[in-house]
A protein has these predicted regions:
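Helix-adjacent hinge/juxtasegments
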Residues: 58-109, 114, 229, 250
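Donor/substrate-binding cores of folate-linked one-carbon enzymes
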Residues: 24, 32, 84, 88-191
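N-terminal Rossmann-like dinucleotide-binding module
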Residues: 1-45, 49
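Short active-site oxyanion
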Residues: 6-8, 33-36, 82-85, 243-247
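Charge-dense, helix-prone N-terminal extensions
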Residues: 191-320
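Structural motif corresponding to alpha-helix initiation and N-cap regions
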Residues: 44, 66-71, 120, 254
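Conserved nucleotide-sugar phosphate-binding/catalytic loop shared by glycosyltransferases and other
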Residues: 45-64
Length: 320
């Protein structure tokens, strides 16, 4: 099985959504594991539940720590090799500098169909508005409260005799269903060939005089004029016994290829048929892909294959 993404769950109370994420992760085909549970209250009941389920727990007291809380939390997350943070009843506003370090990697569950009824007392607001349907929303966390990109929603009917309490009970059931599903879906995209290809394409096509073209059925990118263009990047989709989604780029030769593969076999591979021509493979269907590193390889491969008129301009521009 491919390496699972590592999720940290942050809580402030009982952690029922945390528990849903933990139990869903026990399925054989789940793409994530809950690697850490923490929060802002050391006596939160959810910490006891997580500890009993064998999850690493990092109790923290935000009031006692004051301004040191966020740096300490950052250290705990980095030490645990966390890929994604899932907020589950975490009742603390996250500062912008912390959000910046985790952009696109913090998700939250909210008990309404956003953008309706942001903030607290959502069920009271729903009933006061006369809504016939409400639900749960999973979204990315952004600086603006409950305004990040919506990743998934699940509707819940509002009954004529509902109270905020009865409605909250049913919405919570919906939360427990949708949160693990959307987290798996969101993290699973990093193993999806089309998503990875799209990400590579954005970087490749930002380089000068590049174009998309297939190579023996595989997506690729060329540099140069139409009549004399050359491939500088080709996608690899689990071909010839190498069960990985990867990117083929040009390296300096067989010696460098052998050294890189020996030093980091989890990152590099020698692609069948392409390897003898100095194409090296970079594995991309794994957690924690360094896309800046991918961009560096694409630029390097572009320089190796681009015509002199383009490489000269690139080198001159890099001097300024």
């Amino acid at each position: 099985m491919a390496e699972r993404s590592r999720v940290a769950v942050l809580i402030s109370g009982r952690g029922s959504n945390m528990a849903a994420l933990i139990y869903a992760a026990r399925a054989d085909d789940c793409v994530y594991e809950v690697a850490l549970v923490s929060g802002d209250k050391p006596d939160a009941h959810g910490l006891e539940v997580a500890r009993a389920e064998g999850i690493t727990v990092e109790p923290m007291d935000a009031r006692a720590l004051g301004p040191d809380f966020w740096p300490r939390l950052q250290h705990a997350l980095e030490s645990a090799g966390i890929d994604l943070i899932a907020l589950a009843g975490f009742m603390r506003i996250i500062p912008d500098n912390f959000l910046g370090k985790w952009e696109g990697r913090i998700v939250n569950i909210h008990p309404s169909l956003l953008p309706r009824h942001k903030g607290l007392k959502t069920h009271e607001a729903c009933l006061a508005a006369g809504d016939k349907v409400t639900g749960a929303t999973v979204h990315l966390v952004s600086p603006d409260l409950d305004s990040g990109e919506i990743l998934g929603q699940l509707e819940v009917a509002v009954l004529p005799n509902d109270t905020p309490g009865t409605l909250a009970e049913r919405v919570l059931i919906a939360e427990h269903q949708i949160y693990p599903h959307v987290v798996s879906q969101y993290l699973g995209r990093t193993r999806d060939f089309d998503w990875i290809t799209g990400r590579v394409g954005e970087i490749a096509l930002a380089l000068a005089e590049t174009s998309f073209q297939t190579s023996h059925g595989s997506p690729g990118w060329k540099v140069g004029s139409k009549s004399s263009s050359k491939f500088f990047a080709i996608m690899w989709n689990r071909h010839h016994g190498e069960e990985t989604v990867g990117l083929l780029v040009k390296c300096s030769g067989q010696d460098e290829m052998a050294q890189l593969i020996e030093a980091e076999p989890e990152l590099y591979f020698r692609p069948a048929y392409y390897g003898p021509s100095d194409w090296i493979g970079i594995k991309l269907d794994r957690p924690r892909v360094d896309w800046d590193h991918v961009a560096e390889w694409l630029q390097r491969s572009w320089l190796a294959m681009a015509p002199p008129r383009l490489t000269k301009l690139m080198r001159v521009s890099n001097e300024f």
